[in-house]
């Protein structure tokens, strides 16, 4: 896996239009690969925080090419990790992640909202589980009330999974209670996929009973 990661870093570096931007990218990747919990630009020992800020916000380089390269590499890893023979399972995790923000952000005002009493940027992220690794594949920003719900965004991400994954794997969707809506579950079923999600105890069954009142069987006997 280390050799594959090194190859990916090299391919990403080659996408940079100048040597200066290539060095900035390598400095940013170094912060994450150190895994010290300090990936912010000011912790870089190679480049200044202002240089990395310009690289991320001003310098012209193709985000699409970066995403395309990473996804191609990810698919290669998925297929290399799959077992030969019968159609293997592929776990797809959908998670709602909040990046809490304080203060005012005029340029991102439409992206900052409150969810579960947390103010910030709320991301619906889709991960592919490859061996021991959980690799982010795609994401959408929940924009607050009046916009598509996290469950609706999660369903859109699932629908946009590459067909080659759906054709070669038994895709198993794993998600928490934020994605346990009827629309999400029926949508997954229409796609002929499988899903395991959390369901709030306040949900009602067809017969009117509340989930939390259902008798729990005694397995000790």
Regions found by a protein language model. Give the residues of each.
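Electropositive, glycine- and tryptophan-enriched low-complexity nucleic-acid-binding patches
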Residues: 54-55, 59, 113-168
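Short, conserved catalytic/metal-binding motifs centered on acidic residues
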Residues: 40-44, 48, 88-99, 126, ...
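Gly/serine-rich nucleotide phosphate-binding loop at the start of the catalytic core
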Residues: 1-67, 71
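A common structural microfeature
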Residues: 28, 37, 49-52, 89-96, ...
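Short phosphate-engaging motifs
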Residues: 62, 135, 180
């Amino acid at each position: 896996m280390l050799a594959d990661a090194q190859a990916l870093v090299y391919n990403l570096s080659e996408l940079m239009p100048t040597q200066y931007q290539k060095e900035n990218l390598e400095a940013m990747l170094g912060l994450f690969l150190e895994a010290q919990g300090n990936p912010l630009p000011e912790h870089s020992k190679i480049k200044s925080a202002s240089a990395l800020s310009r690289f991320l916000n001003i310098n012209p380089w193709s985000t699409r090419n970066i995403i395309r390269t990473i996804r191609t590499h990810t698919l290669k890893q998925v297929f290399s990790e799959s077992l030969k023979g019968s159609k293997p399972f592929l776990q797809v995790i959908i998670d709602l992640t909040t990046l809490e923000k304080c203060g005012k952000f005029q340029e991102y005002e439409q992206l900052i909202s409150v969810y579960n009493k947390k103010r910030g940027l709320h991301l619906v992220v889709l991960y592919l589980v490859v061996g021991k690794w959980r690799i982010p594949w795609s994401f959408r920003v929940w924009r607050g009330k009046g916009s598509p719900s996290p469950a609706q965004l999660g369903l859109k991400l699932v629908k946009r999974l590459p067909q080659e994954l759906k054709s070669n794997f038994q895709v198993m969707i794993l998600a928490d209670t934020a994605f346990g809506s009827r629309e999400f579950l029926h949508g997954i079923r229409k796609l002929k996929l499988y899903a395991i999600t959390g369901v709030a105890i306040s949900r009602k069954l067809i017969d009117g009973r509340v989930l939390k009142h259902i008798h729990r069987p005694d397995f000790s006997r």
